[in-house]
Amino acid sequence: MEPKSQDQAPNRDDPDLQTEPLTIAQSITSFYMYNPYEKRSVEVPLTNCDAFISLLKCVIGTGILAMPLAFRCSGFVMGTVMSILLMILLTYSIHLLIADMTECCRRRRVPQVSMPEAVRIAYEEGPKWINCFGRAAGFMTTCVLVFGQFLLCTVYLVFVSKNFKEIGDHYIERYNERYYVLVACLLLLPLFMIRRLKYLVPLNLISNFLLYAGFALIMYYLFNGLPNINDREMVTPPVEWIEFIAIAAFSLTAVGSMLVVEAHMAHPQSYLGLFGVLNLAVLFILLSNMFFGIIGYWRFGDNVHASITLNIPQDEILSQFIKVFIASGIFLSYPLNGFVVITVMFSDYENSEPRGRYRTLIEYVVRLLFLFLTGAVAIGVPNLAALTELEGAFSLSNLNLLCPALIDVFLNYNVGYGRLMWKLIRDILLILIGLIFGIVGCTVALMQLIRDFQLTLNSM
């Protein structure tokens, strides 16, 4: 018998699978009774190097180019401090989430669960009065994951169209930016139809090369003509910090992509840990983001745009090469981040007759709809800064803080929260931070988008 494909959901009718909540004794010993990593079967697995490359590709993109704008909202000192603290918080929450998802696998005796499945299992393990909300909570988590990745892919399309428009305006007739969005969608169509993560690794490698080549070339403009550093703010008023957090959150993490990479690894045990793939990747990402944020703000000050590529000259050959490299790198990032959406949407898809025969066709249709829906939103509200802030605030609050904390609260309900209830206190703090930041950050970004959409309607 062939091993079960990684892309298929476990058969919950299998009598060998545990479907009922475990007792306290069973929960405590579950680690020693079942190791889900040994049971996983991935059709085309990622090596640790593949996973590292894919993680960099997931996170490094338009966010790093927006970090100078983030530092404009915080100042040098406060931006550095908040970047480090935010990365520690986000990385810790990812570790907590993956550890809890692994515990869900042990309790249900299955090789792997998706994030929505983990939420459902956690609700079933919690107090009796919330057990009935498990499926609804799992469905809501799916919606949150899909919407977060939808916003991210929309940001990518807006970024690509803006940069290629600047190049096009110099050589050909000035066309509306929305035409560039449409062309980008058409060119992405064949790449977005790739259905195996392993086969996206070459694209990710090319994308990383283009991005870092562009980053290296842009140093010429960043270091040429640096003003006196005393002309820049060290600490800005606290009212502006919320924008920094939203932009930095967008540039520092991508929960859905991080989970998909871990799920497709040949050796997922190497993902976490002090010197695991995840920690090494986020350290590299943090240093890169801080460097770009500090140098970009130092060079351009209050005139910095939502992407640093929009600050460099439009009519110079070097600047045009930079924009082509970086925009092409971001363009090639879209298939990987869109892959996350498809994985989430089909993780619980029943591979039964007759629908199983049409699963591939349905997946292609969903991919097509997703691509052109992101294009439609990019055409309607091409505000790069506001979209970046909205995606950062939405994903940080829901995926990085609320979901991991709620899963942990309910999973530990029967087992206990440790001495002085420290786990419960930690989870409550994560929930409060997520709620406050989510409400404030999303409100600010949505107000900007509404104003921009009104301007779009008036210009038609």
Curated annotation (Swiss-Prot):
Phenotype reported upon loss of the gene: RNAi-mediated knockdown in adult blood cells results in decreased survival following infection with S.aureus. Adults infected with S.aureus display decreased phagocytosis, increased bacterial load and increased production of reactive oxygen species (ROS) in the hemolymph. Phagocytosis of latex beads is normal, however flies pre-injected with S.aureus display a significant decrease in subsequent bead phagocytosis. Increased survival following infection with L.monocytogenes. Increased extracellular glutamate in the hemolymph.
Subcellular localization(s) per the UniProt record: Cell membrane
Principal location: membrane
Membrane topology term: Multi-pass membrane protein
Keywords from the named record: Amino-acid transport, Cell membrane, Membrane, Phagocytosis, Transmembrane, Transmembrane helix, Transport
Transmembrane regions listed in the UniProt entry: 51-71, 78-98, 139-159, 181-201, 203-223, 241-261, 275-295, 324-344, 368-388, 390-410, 428-448
GO biological process, alphabetically ordered: amino acid transmembrane transport; defense response to bacterium; phagocytosis; sexual reproduction
Entry coiled-coil feature ranges: none
GO molecular function, one term: L-amino acid transmembrane transporter activity
GO CC annotations, alphabetized: extracellular space; plasma membrane; vacuolar membrane
Keyword Metal-binding included in the entry's annotation: no
Protein family per UniProt: Belongs to the amino acid/polyamine transporter 2 family.
Function field: Probable glutamate transporter which transports extracellular glutamate into the cells. Regulates the production of intracellular reactive oxygen species (ROS) probably by controlling the synthesis of antioxidant glutathione. By regulating ROS production in blood cells, required for maintaining bacteria phagocytosis following infection with S.aureus and possibly E.coli.
Note from the entry: The name 'polyphemus' derives from the Cyclops in Greek mythology that failed to guard against Odysseus as mutants are unable to defend against microbial infection.
Protein name: Glutamate transporter polyphemus
Lineage, highest ranks first: Eukaryota, Metazoa, Ecdysozoa, Arthropoda, Hexapoda
